Amino acid sequence: MGVALGAGLAVSIAGIGGGIGMGIAGGKAFEAIARQPEVGGDVRTLLFITLAFIETLTIYGLLIAFMLVGKA
């Protein structure tokens, strides 16, 4: 039971943290584009790269959950 609880916590905390991080990053990027529309393309490119890194951390949480369940 402890392994299942740990796996669930790993996925949920990683997912919640990733979702909050993506929301904050997206909001700030849109604020920057609204303030200076001429740099919209550059900001959008950096936003997509940042979102990919955030999603990678979320996938690591899922990987840890699979590793925990695999040991049980």
Curated annotation (Swiss-Prot):
Source superkingdom: Bacteria
Pfam families: ATP-synt_C
Membrane topology: Multi-pass membrane protein
Site positions per UniProt: Reversibly protonated during proton transport: 55
Keywords linked to the UniProt accession: ATP synthesis, Cell membrane, CF(0), Hydrogen ion transport, Ion transport, Lipid-binding, Membrane, Transmembrane, Transmembrane helix, Transport
Location(s), subcellular: Cell membrane
InterPro entries with a match to the protein in the record: ATP_synth_csu_bac/chlpt, ATP_synth_F0_csu, ATP_synth_F0_csu_DDCD_BS, ATP_synth_F0_csu_sf, ATPase_proteolipid_c-like_dom, F/V-ATP_Csub_sf
MF terms in GO: lipid binding; proton-transporting ATP synthase activity, rotational mechanism
GO annotation, cellular component aspect: plasma membrane; proton-transporting ATP synthase complex; proton-transporting two-sector ATPase complex, proton-transporting domain
Similarity section: Belongs to the ATPase C chain family.
HAMAP family (UniProt xref): ATP_synth_c_bact (MF_01396)
Subunit structure, as described in the record: F-type ATPases have 2 components, F(1) - the catalytic core - and F(0) - the membrane proton channel. F(1) has five subunits: alpha(3), beta(3), gamma(1), delta(1), epsilon(1). F(0) has three main subunits: a(1), b(2) and c(10-14). The alpha and beta chains form an alternating ring which encloses part of the gamma chain. F(1) is attached to F(0) by a central stalk formed by the gamma and epsilon chains, while a peripheral stalk is formed by the delta and b chains.
Function: F(1)F(0) ATP synthase produces ATP from ADP in the presence of a proton or sodium gradient. F-type ATPases consist of two structural domains, F(1) containing the extramembraneous catalytic core and F(0) containing the membrane proton channel, linked together by a central stalk and a peripheral stalk. During catalysis, ATP synthesis in the catalytic domain of F(1) is coupled via a rotary mechanism of the central stalk subunits to proton translocation.
Name of the molecule in the record: ATP synthase subunit c
Taxonomic source organism: Syntrophomonas wolfei subsp. wolfei (strain DSM 2245B / Goettingen)
Designated gene of the protein: atpE
